């Protein structure tokens, strides 16, 4: 199992690098990430959240775990919806985030094969959330400044814990 990195850890702000090797080490890393995600009752976990600055994440929105490697969002619907999101890198913080209702995505699986699919509703939201992590974008970047100000003390406490 991995230790989940929390707000304040610099790895969360970096743009992750593409995965180039689809080997046993990647499979083991993904298995460990899935174990970590379930341990913390998450529905998604991006590699940067466990200190790995590479473009992949795992998610499970009810149909079993999926590894998403080198993802792209090909299309995002103009229709959006607002819903509450949490993040393992922001313990006990939940904020309302506006995201596209539908996305058309392409990614590679653990064998390096390309997968293309359309996601709607909750699966689309989770995909977009985890995709943000690969670009160094966090949930607090997607909320209004006034709301961020209200969370300032809690964010500072989390950042302090990241430094040990």
Swiss-Prot record:
Q: Which GO terms describe its molecular function?
A: metal ion binding; peptide deformylase activity
Residues at which Fe cation binds: 87, 129, 133
What enzyme class is recorded for this protein? hydrolase
Give the protein's cofactors: Fe(2+)
Annotated GO biological process: co-translational protein modification; translation
Q: How is the cofactor bound?
A: Binds 1 Fe(2+) ion.
* Superkingdom per UniProt: Bacteria
Q: Which InterPro entries match?
A: Peptide_deformylase (IPR023635), Peptide_deformylase_sf (IPR036821)
Keywords in alphabetical order: Hydrolase, Iron, Metal-binding, Protein biosynthesis
Q: What Pfam families does the record tag this protein with?
A: Pep_deformylase (PF01327)
Q: What is its EC number?
A: 3.5.1.88
Q: Where is the active site?
A: 130
Q: Does the keyword Amino-acid biosynthesis apply?
A: no
Report the catalytic activity. Answer: N-terminal N-formyl-L-methionyl-[peptide] + H2O = N-terminal L-methionyl-[peptide] + formate
What the protein does comes down to: Removes the formyl group from the N-terminal Met of newly synthesized proteins. Requires at least a dipeptide for an efficient rate of reaction. N-terminal L-methionine is a prerequisite for activity but the enzyme has broad specificity at other positions.
Q: Which family does it belong to?
A: Belongs to the polypeptide deformylase family.
**What's the name of the protein?**
Peptide deformylase
């Amino acid at each position: 199992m991995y230790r989940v990195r929390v707000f304040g850890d610099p790895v969360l702000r970096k743009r992750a690098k593409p995965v180039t090797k689809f080997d046993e080490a990647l499979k083991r890393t993904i298995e460990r990430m899935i174990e970590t995600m379930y341990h913390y009752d998450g529905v998604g976990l991006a590699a940067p959240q466990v200190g790995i600055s590479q473009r992949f994440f795992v998610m499970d929105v009810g149909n079993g775990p999926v590894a998403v490697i080198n993802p792209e969002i090909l299309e995002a619907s103009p229709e959006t919806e607002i819903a509450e999101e949490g993040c393992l890198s922001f313990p006990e913080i939940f904020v309302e985030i506006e995201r596209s209702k539908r996305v058309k995505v392409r990614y590679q699986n653990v064998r390096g094969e390309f997968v293309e699919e359309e996601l709607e509703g909750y699966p689309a939201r989770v995909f977009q959330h985890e995709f943000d992590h690969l670009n160094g974008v966090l949930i607090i970047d997607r909320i209004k400044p006034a709301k961020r100000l209200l969370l300032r003390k809690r964010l500072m406490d989390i950042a302090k814990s990241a430094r040990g």
